[in-house]
């Protein structure tokens, strides 16, 4: 699939810079963090970068499947939950990290599990923005048509871009 005129391709270098900038914003909050929870799979890379920048050693994952056919969000399904020790105190002192908050459905499910956790994402669309505490880029309306899955890199060499709907108001 070729990129449309309004594509927002993200290189690994740009993504790394944006994730580091997100880490610096979180560092500016001057809080003690006990762990990071990465929303898989997209949150794994920014979580690793943020952990490194902030000196956090405990990393957990939560896996929620939503893009079953890689083109549109389907029914949400929790494939792997969060360990009990991080759920204590409703997630206080935990940073939840994802690469992109699209509709906010995934963040809402994790927010129910950890209402006092701090939610951070590298990129956010307007619909998902209210669920995020700290982000690098928000309000991606108007120029983000496609978001890279694997950031445009795939072992087969194929283009891997997930179509996303910009002006969804439902």
Swiss-Prot record:
CDD domains with a match to the protein in the record: PRTases_typeI (cd06223)
CC annotations in GO: plasma membrane
Enzyme class, broadest EC rank: transferase
Bilayer disposition of the protein: Peripheral membrane protein
Magnesium recorded as keyword: yes
Reaction(s) catalysed (UniProt annotation): GMP + diphosphate = guanine + 5-phospho-alpha-D-ribose 1-diphosphate; XMP + diphosphate = xanthine + 5-phospho-alpha-D-ribose 1-diphosphate; IMP + diphosphate = hypoxanthine + 5-phospho-alpha-D-ribose 1-diphosphate
Pathways involved: Purine metabolism; GMP biosynthesis via salvage pathway; GMP from guanine: step 1/1; Purine metabolism; XMP biosynthesis via salvage pathway; XMP from xanthine: step 1/1
Matching PANTHER family: XANTHINE PHOSPHORIBOSYLTRANSFERASE, XANTHINE-GUANINE PHOSPHORIBOSYLTRANSFERASE
The family this protein is said to belong to: Belongs to the purine/pyrimidine phosphoribosyltransferase family. XGPT subfamily.
Protein name, entry field: Xanthine-guanine phosphoribosyltransferase
